[in-house]
Amino acid sequence: MAVISMKELLEAGVHFGHQTRRWDPKMDEYIFTERNGIHIIDLQKTVKLVDEAYNFIRNASTDGANVLFVGTKKQASDAIAEEATRAGQYYINHRWLGGTLTNWNTIKTRIQRLKDLQTMAEDGTFEQLPKKEVVLLNKQREKLEKFLGGIQDMPGLPDVLFVVDPKKEEIAVKEANMLNIPVVAMIDTNANPDVVDVKIPANDDAIRAVRLITSKIADAVIEGRQGQDSAPEDAFVEGDENTESIEEIANIVEEGNN
């Protein structure tokens, strides 16, 4: 059984790539055609590669791997936080701080500062301080929570990165590459696939597309952690006899652009 159906991908708009003039030629093998100046992603390949990504994440999670979900653009921010949390994993969904991986010891000191401020806010310490100082400390706490809240409980460097848009998250991907941390990524037609270990050709600019793929990655983590008998009931889809052929999808796309 496939993890995802062609119909699901189509309905979420996963097939829409970028304008042809913005493409990266290395993505050519994942492009089915071009319609009205827009590249159309080959969803048959996406179905297979989602399966590969799912299996990779599931197997890593079975071995206890920690997965860091990364997606800082507005289309990805909510889904990244919600799905990582659902899977009991970690996330960065606002801004990637340079050195998050390669300078982890420094990041750990900032995380400890965040935890100290959270404790001070909860144990009554703030009530004993001047109001002006409390205002400044709260601002510091809120800023640290925004950028580091999703990784404050991460025990160490992640074992795998799941990234939405490696072009946008270039620094995160470079750091992972330097440390030999595998990168699984949703990658659109404008990005270089060579920097990614496990590729999912997909529209990484549509909220529905991002949420669909990210939810499958979260399902993979959950299955890996809990065992196959406890896999999410909707993690797999039965073979759909009515699934459109790639030619029919092309026709649907063409009609939608008219």
UniProtKB/Swiss-Prot annotation:
PROSITE patterns: RIBOSOMAL_S2_1, RIBOSOMAL_S2_2. GO terms for molecular function: structural constituent of ribosome. GO terms for biological process: translation. It comes from the Bacteria. One of its GO terms (cellular component) is cytosolic small ribosomal subunit. InterPro entries: Ribosomal_uS2, Ribosomal_uS2_bac/mit/plastid, Ribosomal_uS2_CS, Ribosomal_uS2_flav_dom_sf. The keyword rRNA processing does not apply. Keywords: Ribonucleoprotein, Ribosomal protein. It holds the Pfam family Ribosomal_S2. Belongs to the universal ribosomal protein uS2 family. HAMAP family: Ribosomal_uS2_B. This is Small ribosomal subunit protein uS2. It comes from Leuconostoc mesenteroides subsp. mesenteroides (strain ATCC 8293 / DSM 20343 / BCRC 11652 / CCM 1803 / JCM 6124 / NCDO 523 / NBRC 100496 / NCIMB 8023 / NCTC 12954 / NRRL B-1118 / 37Y).
